[in-house]
A protein has these predicted regions:
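Conserved, mostly hydrophobic/aromatic
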Residues: 43, 106, 114
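Soluble or luminal CAZymes and related metallo-dependent hydrolases
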Residues: 18-25, 91-98, 126
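Aromatic-rich peripheral "rim/lid" segments of glycoside hydrolase catalytic domains that contact
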Residues: 95, 105, 120-140
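Solvent-exposed, polar/charged alpha-helical surfaces in well-ordered, non-transmembrane soluble domains
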Residues: 25-28, 100-104, 108, 132, ...
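Substrate-binding surface in catalytic domains of secreted glycosidases
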Residues: 1-70
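Hydrophobic, secondary-structure "cap" segments at the distal end of domains
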Residues: 49, 56-111
Length: 140
């Protein structure tokens, strides 16, 4: 799993919990440093976000399912973003742009695949589904 780099603990940054930079660094660690064949590595990404109650403190951060983010922030086109700041709160998650970037990286670099955690947190609508973005990348 390559996520949960930020959260509700006191020393946490108020930032993306599952960034592309963390994703590629972990992939490099497992393949290059640990010497595991890329085609045997399945890289994980979250179908949920972390909502911070303030843009300056991790206190009170909560996990939000991606499908809940889609509903709560419907007016903000959340599928096409990776973070939304509203009413003093900020939520970071993997929307279509970041999932596409990660999926392209996996395919272009010969990794074995992607694990989406937690699948039940994804949207069931093909237009907003994260799994659908991954699927379309792998069948190109």
């Amino acid at each position: 799993a390559i996520y949960n780099f930020t959260g509700a603990w006191a020393s946490s940054a108020v930032a993306q919990h599952a960034s592309f930079e963390h994703f590629t660094a972990a992939a490099t660690q497992w393949s290059t440093v640990n010497g595991i064949d890329k085609n045997k590595i399945i890289l994980g990404l979250p179908a949920y976000g972390i909502q911070f109650q303030s843009t300056s403190s991790p206190t009170g951060a909560v996990r939000k399912a991606y499908k809940v983010i889609l509903t709560e922030y419907a007016a903000d086109s959340p599928a096409e973003k990776d973070e939304i700041e509203k009413n003093g709160k900020i939520v970071f998650y993997n929307g279509h742009p970041l999932v596409q970037q990660k999926s392209d990286y996996v395919v272009d670099n010969g990794f074995g695949g992607i694990l989406l955690n937690e699948l039940s947190d994804d949207s069931e609508d093909d237009a907003t589904s994260l799994l659908n973005v991954i699927y379309k990348t792998f069948i190109k």
